[in-house]
Amino acid sequence: MPDRGGGPTGPRIRVGRPSRRVRTLLMTLGVLAVLGMAFVMFAGFWTDWLWYRSVKYSSVFTTTLSTKIGLFFVFGLLMAVAVGVNIWLAHRLRPPLSAMSMEQQSLDRYRMGIAPYKKWLLLGITSLVGLIAGASASSQWRTWLMWVNGVPFHQKDPQFHLDVSFYAFDLPWYRFLLGFGFAAAVLSLIAAALTHYLYGGLRITSPGARATAAATGHLSVLLGIFVALKAVAYWLDRYGLAVKSSDFKATGNWTGLRYVDANAYLPAKTILFCIAVICALLFFATLWRRTWQLPVIGFGLMVLSAILIGGLYPAIVQKFQVQPNEQAKEAPYVEKNLKATREAYGIDGAKVTEYPGKSDTTDKTKLRDDADATASVRLLDPNVVSPTFQQLQQMRNYYAFPTNLDVDRYSKDGKDQDTVIGLRELNLNGIPKNNWINDHFRYTHGFGVVAAKGTTADSEGRPVFTESDLPSRGDLKAYQQRIYYGEKTSQYSIVGGPQKEIDYSDDSGEKTTSYQGKSGVNLSSPINRAAYAVAFSEPQILYSGAIGEGSRILYNRTPKERVEAVAPWLTIDGDAYPAVVDNKIQWIVDAYTTTNGYPYASRTTLGDTTADSLTANNNQRAVVAQQNQVNYIRNSVKATVDAYTGKVTLFEWDTKDPVLKTWEKAFPGTVKPKGDIPKSLIDHLRYPQDLFKVQRELLTRYHVKDAQTFLSGSEVWQVPDDPSNKSGNAVPPYYLSMKMPDQQAQTFSLTTTLTPNGRDNLSAFMSVNAEAGTSDYGKIRILKLPTSRTVDGPKQVQSQFNSEQDIAESIRLLKGGDSEVEYGNLLTVPLDGGLLYVEPVYVRGGGLKYPLLRKVLVTYGGNTAFEDTLDEALNKVFGADSTTQPPDEGTTKPPTSSNPTVQEALNDAQKAFDAGQEALKKPDWQAYAKAQKDLEDALKRAEDAQAEADKASGGSKSGDSGKGSGPTSSPSGSASSSPSSSPSSDKSPSSDKSPGSD
């Protein structure tokens, strides 16, 4: 065992004070650390201010900042004062002499230990709770602004007859104040009790009285305040019943009072309020009675009442009054919920029409002509053909198209054309060498719009481009083609300085440019450069010679994040889409105002409701929600973002929305009136997809208007899974120009199908007029199918396509030669009482792996066709040819080459392709297989010959990449060599349609 004696254990080491030099060094390091942290915080604040000022929305920054600071200091100070005063008061009320007991003797050591630091300890505790409370309060800036600026809805709830604004704007703020009050009371009570215990005012094990009179009175007042706040909570809970959600009839977010709420919970809350008030008064009376006997009894009775009256009694009412006769008891409350929910989601005007689902028309020619007149069927699926755009129009590896393209309308010769559109955006992953200069100075922007007809493809299965090539040319005339702001521009760029930017490349080589716009933040100031160097953790910004006079930094460059930043009170639609408006590329962003405080309106979860097979594979299409659970939504704002200047403009769209009016009061001047929207922009506005997805989900239950049907659950629908893939995710809605049975002409519409809950047959077809500027824009039409007849739904139709023997054999052949078959959007069109289904079939051929339109599947009235073109398929299905003038299919001849070897191979490929088409018509599968092999051999020879020619000429020339280099309509999908491997254009710089820098 070690020696525990008192002998010497070795020399003692005395630790003296550090030398002056060490103290100076430590102090210097400490000061530098503090200054460094201060500058980091300053850099974040300063760069935010500079950005908001650059986009001319500085009022948004100052309003939100001042509100946050005000809430932080007010509530932080209130909490600090509440806790500090009670600690001080408990110390002031301490007994002059503590009892002589072991407990008090133990506490003496602590009292003596903290005596020299009492003031600092008090300051530290109050500062800590104040900081926490202030930070929590500052996060409620939206709640505060809505309460201060709230405008009435001019609609009253059916139970308490209060304006909806009370629930949407007032009640959330009152609940925050109540929560803050509870926190202050509890913290003060704990702090006071600990202080009383430390200084002898409270005793746990000592003999005699457990508390002094002063401690008893002090703690009784705090307990009385707590119970009084509980009384206020009971009173507010009465109104909270109108916005309370519950699981009712498999509707997890059913909102509003039910029978048990109105007849059990509501009177129970009133009774508990009265009991809590009496109990609070008993605690306050302790100041005079100096005993806790009555208040403790009262508090116990309050807890017992909460269990019996607030819990057991409603359960008894539900069990013995409601459940035996549920429909009769709940019907009046369900009617209130139906009405409020339909109003809150804007579906109260939905028109439901009975639709037979089967045509009685026997005139085949009429049916065939009606098919052309009813819809302009979009064969080009924007969610499939992005790789085709990429292959044919990428031009350079540092350009890319989005995963999902967009659908818009453009007029030509006075007629609207559904158009699939995408922007050739910057792709930093494709630049020759990644370094700081290349990533942020040289490669700064995309270039040009690429657009194609949505209703047709050329004879080779490729898109019929209406705008293409680099620089772009086509139907859109002159416009600013440079894209500095887009969905793929997620990194910052520094432009306008001495470093030139890569503009585009053509046959004559690379073109350079320098940004002439006014957006971005000027980096001429050393302070600005230092702030951004810290904010972006890029020290090069501070000292790089590539930054000079006129240099500007562009960031926050995606359309959605720019709109979200300038309007942080808006929920942003997941799909921003581009349009050429007034010679500029404008990103159009739909934005919503929401609340979850609309009485009796059932809630929905935006993230779940707007999810489908597209968002599952592309999270950039997910909605940007300010609050995920809502029970009121309006598409109140249409926003635009200029792709060149980055300018953000907010336009009022729903002029009656009280939530928008509230935010306009809070941020005056940020939203322009609806009348300021130019006609050229209105032509491209459309009904937003995310709002439509929310509405269709609600309409699966709320298409019924009577309570009995709702309660029976006999007409519950569901959104079907996407039949074109096996992901199990919901089918997305589709845009196409069509007319419903009660419409006289085609309109740009957003459509979807609905099936019975748990089954695959069709229940309803739903569409909304998506064409802004028309009289019935936003009108929802629902065609309800009869329950007495089974009408095939999308999944069943897809299954029929896959199981029909002739089609299955053709699909098997299309998959030959290392090709992949991909189904496009399965479109549904109501036609003469029946339903026409159309699905394009794409083939990704060989090693090129980009889809080309090969076949069209059509079914109507039990007849199915699988043909090369839509017209052929419709003719076969209806057994009659159209008597109307067919649209221009944009057929192009196979391209030629100046290289004799390549041209010879292309001629052989064309012959093989023609032979294969003839073999398919017979059908002669053996001959088709031989022609397929000959075609692949010929294309391989053409590709090899072209590669040799490019190598011999230094790779500076290539064919027109918009057309390819071979007859790419082979059923295997084999195609020309990749345009991206030889991306130069056949146009001179003079073909640049850009009107110049603006």
From Swiss-Prot:
<dbReference type="InterPro" id="IPR005372">
    <property type="entry name" value="UPF0182"/>
</dbReference>
<keyword id="KW-0812">Transmembrane</keyword>
<feature type="compositionally biased region" description="Basic and acidic residues">
    <location>
        <begin position="939"/>
        <end position="951"/>
    </location>
</feature>
<keyword id="KW-1133">Transmembrane helix</keyword>
<feature type="transmembrane region" description="Helical">
    <location>
        <begin position="219"/>
        <end position="236"/>
    </location>
</feature>
<feature type="transmembrane region" description="Helical">
    <location>
        <begin position="25"/>
        <end position="47"/>
    </location>
</feature>
<feature type="transmembrane region" description="Helical">
    <location>
        <begin position="69"/>
        <end position="91"/>
    </location>
</feature>
<dbReference type="GO" id="GO:0005576">
    <property type="term" value="C:extracellular region"/>
</dbReference>
<comment type="similarity">
    <text>Belongs to the UPF0182 family.</text>
</comment>
<feature type="transmembrane region" description="Helical">
    <location>
        <begin position="120"/>
        <end position="137"/>
    </location>
</feature>
<feature type="compositionally biased region" description="Low complexity">
    <location>
        <begin position="966"/>
        <end position="998"/>
    </location>
</feature>
<keyword id="KW-0472">Membrane</keyword>
<feature type="region of interest" description="Disordered">
    <location>
        <begin position="939"/>
        <end position="998"/>
    </location>
</feature>
<feature type="transmembrane region" description="Helical">
    <location>
        <begin position="295"/>
        <end position="317"/>
    </location>
</feature>
<feature type="transmembrane region" description="Helical">
    <location>
        <begin position="266"/>
        <end position="288"/>
    </location>
</feature>
<feature type="compositionally biased region" description="Polar residues">
    <location>
        <begin position="893"/>
        <end position="902"/>
    </location>
</feature>
<protein>
    <recommendedName>
        <fullName>UPF0182 protein SAV_3055</fullName>
    </recommendedName>
</protein>
<keyword id="KW-1003">Cell membrane</keyword>
<feature type="transmembrane region" description="Helical">
    <location>
        <begin position="176"/>
        <end position="198"/>
    </location>
</feature>
<dbReference type="GO" id="GO:0005886">
    <property type="term" value="C:plasma membrane"/>
</dbReference>
<feature type="region of interest" description="Disordered">
    <location>
        <begin position="879"/>
        <end position="902"/>
    </location>
</feature>
<dbReference type="Pfam" id="PF03699">
    <property type="entry name" value="UPF0182"/>
</dbReference>
